[in-house]
Amino acid sequence: MLEGIRIVEIEGLGPTPFAGMMFADLGAEVTVIHRKDKSIFSNPKNILDRGKRSIELDLKDPKDLEIAKKIIFRSDALIEGFRPGVMENFGLGPDDLNENPLLVYGRMTGWGQNCLLYTSPSPRDATLSRMPSSA
């Protein structure tokens, strides 16, 4: 169904790895950029990585960042789920990647891009537990 579509997934939590898995299940070529520090998410037995290619990069390293950009520029879509500003700090925000004007940039954040809750210094779970609807 999605054969020939290339998607880059930036390793993260929440809906992003699920979306990447679904895209891969539907035939897309999904490449996950894992953290080089061997995070818990880059476990080779992680079911969410089924059908995906992967590469470990340190996006704070200029050489690795250039490799990531080359992969992204050859892709049809990018998906990520970081807090607002994180990808921009890496130089990988939507405005930074306009070298590929056809790139579909998918953001899947818990609070959207403009919600005041994302500025909370506490972890997301603690923020969620303070909300009346989750008590």
Give the location of each predicted region:
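N-terminal helix-loop segment corresponding to the beta1-alpha1 unit
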Residues: 1-120
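Single conserved hydrophobic/aromatic residue that forms the stacking wall/gate
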Residues: 118-121, 125-135
